[in-house]
């Protein structure tokens, strides 16, 4: 039966993965990831759970089966005692050099689910902490949620997936947009996946700016790719401005008709710099920006372009934006502005129902 399914990684996602030898081979090493049980309890009525794990060299002298079984069985019994059942537990015992067909991100372990169409591609996800989990999702034609204990933990995953399950987002088109912008000064391509998380591929030629853009996606709870070839032999002005315009357009397109979104976001404070942001996806562009910088540049990024970036993205998103920061370190102030923008955007684009969040009936 086709149904929403979560293909969940084990080590580093459900349970902590030791950084010393990357093996859970004793009860002493068994430690659940924070709030994984409450999250799975919230999700179990909406999704089928399938555990998919690579266990390098399982059954060999480097990782005997019996040393794996004891903590694994204890983990499974703990989940069962709390009302959490997995449809299957699928394990690849091979090492990368074995070149098998079942090691993630390859899909042979899940061949039954593929052949019998047992999962709904529109409402199923891979959840895991590694890039191979994201690649597995791509190979299956579904979305990925790349687990991180801070940036995308189990509380945030449950919040995201419950929103989808309750509003039956599977009947909607995926919130994705691609924008290509070419001028005499820049050649830009932006891709945005609002309902996915994972590795962001951002290359603008301005290192500090790349890092700031990554903060927006990471704290916004979505995934994006940005490539920009700009006239950096002059300066970075056109690169920053045109990237903001293209990103704002992509976000606006991905959000779509705004039906069901929260619309508003408000965050304060953030980090030691006391960054604050309020946002309304109102269709009426406006910005009020307040931050002062002592330095002309942070790395290869002109500090004066910070305000210009947020002005450009607010006007192309058609958003009302109030954003400010205060502090002593210019690097930290700029980074906190991008982070708080991402966190506020996360609130505003969150799906909460099916109604248009406006008394006027239009946004």
From Swiss-Prot:
Any Gene Ontology biological process: L-histidine biosynthetic process
Q: What is its EC number?
A: 3.1.3.15, 4.2.1.19
Give the record's keywords alphabetically: Amino-acid biosynthesis, Cytoplasm, Histidine biosynthesis, Hydrolase, Lyase, Magnesium, Metal-binding, Multifunctional enzyme, Zinc
> Where, if anywhere, are coiled coils annotated?
none
Q: Which GO terms describe its molecular function?
A: histidinol-phosphatase activity; imidazoleglycerol-phosphate dehydratase activity; metal ion binding
Q: Does the keyword Hydrolase apply?
A: yes
Q: Where mainly found?
A: cytoplasm
Q: Which residues bind Mg(2+)?
A: 9, 11, 129
State what protein this is by name: Histidine biosynthesis bifunctional protein HisB
What is this enzyme's catalytic activity, as reactions? Answer: D-erythro-1-(imidazol-4-yl)glycerol 3-phosphate = 3-(imidazol-4-yl)-2-oxopropyl phosphate + H2O; L-histidinol phosphate + H2O = L-histidinol + phosphate
Q: Where is this region: Histidinol-phosphatase?
A: 1-174
CDD domains noted in UniProt: HAD_HisB-N, IGPD
Name any one Pfam family assigned in the record: IGPD
- One GO location term (cellular component): cytoplasm
SUPFAM superfamilies (alphabetical)? HAD-like (SSF56784), Ribosomal protein S5 domain 2-like (SSF54211)
